Each structure stands twice: as structure tokens, then as C-alpha cells.
């Protein structure tokens, strides 16, 4: 696999690139140093921070045995392997730390970055073990199943034919604002799986994929269980641990943080506002806006309802307008923590209170919003873990690689490399198109044909005096021959131009196909396309291949991998 690294700063996809904050965070600039010192607690580039955080986590009192029992039960439910069970058991020791990542449940695992997050956690856990052999590091995947964005959780996309197809699952009976994870798949899921499989071309690997999806996505299952079962099958040979936050046992572990949010509301929101002000003074926009209470209330139907704070000591649950005093709501949370769900601001706080989180592996958006939460961590008496960018890939199929070779020939200078073609493609696609048009038309041809015509005319003119001297009638024959030669050259010129235009059109069509493959709907491939499109063509070993690529490279650059 040929692999090329591109700095995030160079990437500008048709719809949008990466935020300036994320580009600075992955750069080697003064801006990064300022960002880290003002918005994060730890810098993953500083060795001293590693030793400091290891000592801190080893000394903290986590409910490790309760956590292990919960994870064992969950992973058994999700079809976890013996290797995963062994990884869970390691968490009983105070010298075991978690490398955490996570994502919302997605149909058939959703966009490819879900897989890349899991792989990144596995690889970074292994690298930390190599650096600190006296400690254990286990990769934990937090399943965000309490999110109520059902449209996102129930859809996925893949390439089909000459375009893009989106598959949407209807799900069983569902209320508005109901959590996506526990939603039943319903009777329509069998047809959804069939539609998805029909879009995959026949291959040696398709029967195995069909068996996996049909067994995981059954009418009586839920979006969360199907997602977790599929992830466990894909990572059965890897030490990945899945964590669901829906279980009442987990909420009991999280109860101190949930209750503290109610007890101190709206203090954490003020913390976010203050940290956001620091960000904005550095020129970065705030990504997340806090609420007075950064919790949702879960009713009996599984709906996530907002909690408002109309006055300092009074709370209201919307839209039902149930009213509680602070004391009443706090007592309710202490007795029934399973009825509360953290929002995007409190979620990482709960995560790092329950888990011995050494590092969080996040995407560009997560790095941005975590930069707003430093003061919230401090309020809850926590140190923010290392925030490490996840692995980011673009997979380039052989047909697209061949197009890149043609682009290289048309636009290339003697020293132009394939990597520079990718940089041009990811950096300024329109400029690359102009280069291709210019290269295909070959503006030097006009001058070359004019030079040939001039030389032929001059050569024939040189013959004329000698021919006339020999026989005056030859002058007419010479003139006729000159006209014929000019006509022949003109015909060759026209055929050359037609070939150039045809080549130009073919190249642009091929570039359009490459653009669809690399930037479907104008966004990076990893944010939209489902991994099974590639597993069907290249086999389940593709996940192992990408793991090896990640093992050899930093996640601070985007990785272009030619398959």
C-alpha cells in the first residue's frame, strides 16, 4: 500500500476543509503552543505530561471492579471475544489505563471514521504499552447510543454504479426525541439489509458480509445492539472494549457527576462561556453553546427532554413543564440516575470520572469542542486527558490511482511527484482542473506547427530557382505540391487538436469520478462512505492493513492510502 501524508492545513475539500483550530492543534507552530497552554491540561508531545498523568490516574479511586463487571456483562451481550474479555479484566488493576474513543451508533457502523477511531484507539494503546511496559493500556469504544439524532443514526451511504446511494432504516415504533440506540430495528430492517447488500457487487467476501449483517440486524434487535455486535465481529481479533452508557449500572457509576451538575447548575455553563471567551480572543469560534443544565431527563418512553432553570433554585422539564426544586431534582437524580443523560458538555466529564482515561482519541470536531471544556473539568476536580487526533484516511482504489497517473503526466513538471498531485487535488481542485486543461491542450503545438509550415515553405522556395532554370513549367508543379503539403500539415494539425480535446474531455471526466470517490458530496470520504463498500472488495484484512499503516505513522497528518 502506497501511503502519502498531507498536512491538514493543505486540505480544502469542495464543501469545507478542517477548522483553523484543528489545523493549529496538529501543526508545529506558536499558535499550537498557545492553544494547548490555554485550553488543555496536557500536551501529548511532552514526555513530562505522560509521567504526571500516569501517576495521577494510578492514585485516583475508580470503581474498577464494578466497571469491569459491567463491561463483562455488556461485551457478553454484544458477542465479545475471549481476547476482549481478557482486556476488560486488566482494568481491575490501578496500573491499567484506558485509551478512549467513541461515536454515535450508525447503521452498519455508519461512516468510515467510526472504524478509524476504533483502530486509532487500538494502535495508540499498543504504542503506550511499548513506551510504558509497567502499565497496561486498553482501548475502550464509548457507544453514544443516547443521542436522539435518529436520521443520522439510521442512514449510511456507499458508492454504487456511477454514483452514490444512501440507505435509510425506518426503525420500529419511535417517539420524537427518543434515544436512537434503544430504538427497535423493526420488521423493515430485513429489507434494508437486502437493499444494502444488493448495492454491493458480487465478490469472494460478500457472503461473509451478508451473514454478519443478517445475523446482527434482526427485527427484534435495537440499533445499539446491532451496532455493537457488528463492531465486535469486525474487531474480534483486536483488544477493543465496547462500553454502553444505557445500563443502570453505568448510570450509578456516573451518579456523582450527574448530581453535581444539578447541585451546581448553572456553574458549568458559566465555565464554558468563560473558556469560549478565551478561545474567541485567540481567533477561534466557539463550537458548542451550553445550557443552564447540561443534562437531559429521560422519561419512560426513552425521550431525552431538556431541563431548564427558570430561577436559581427551580427547574423545569420541557415540554411537559414538570417543575422541581433543586433539592427535589437532586434527590431524584440520587435515587434514579438512570433517568438522566449528559449532553455534549457533560459527556466527557462523566466518561473521565468513570474511566481511568489516559487519552481521548477524537476527530476534528471533538478536538474543537473539548477546547471549550477545560474549566468544566476543573470544576469537577478532574484533569482533562490527552486529546489525540484520530487517524484520518482517504482510500484510493486502483482505478483512481490510474487517473492520478494520467493527471501526473498531463500536469507534471519533471520533478512533480504523486504526492504533489494529491496535495493539488486536496488543496485546490479547480486550480488542478485548469492545469489539466492547459496541459491537455498543449499550447506549444501552435508554435510547433507554424514552425514546420515555415520550414517547409522555406525549403520549397530554395528549390524554385533551380527548378525554373531547368524547366519553367516545374514552377507550377512546385506551387501545386506546396499547396498539397500545406493541406496535409493542416489535416494533421486538426486531427491533433481533436485528439487533444478528446484527451482533455476524458481526463476531466476521470477527474470528476475521482472527485466523487475522494470527496463524495463535497466532503472527505471518511465522513460519508460505509466501510463495507471497501471490505466487500478488498476483504476483512483491510482493517488489519489500515492498522499497520497507523502503526507506522502519526495521526497528526491525513493519510492517503492507495489500495
Swiss-Prot record:
Q: Which controlled-vocabulary keywords does the entry list?
A: Coiled coil, Ligase
This entry's Gene Ontology molecular function terms read: ligase activity
EC number assigned by the record:
6.-.-.-
Q: Where do the coiled-coil regions begin and end? A: 494-518
Kindly report, in one word, the top-level EC class recorded for this enzyme. ligase
InterPro entries found in the cross-reference section: Bacillithiol_biosynth_BshC, CC_BshC, Rossmann-like_BshC
Report whether Ligase shows up as a keyword of the record.
Answer: yes
Q: What protein family does this chain belong to?
A: Belongs to the BshC family.
Protein name (record): Putative cysteine ligase BshC
Species of provenance: Chlorobaculum parvum (strain DSM 263 / NCIMB 8327) (Chlorobium vibrioforme subsp. thiosulfatophilum)
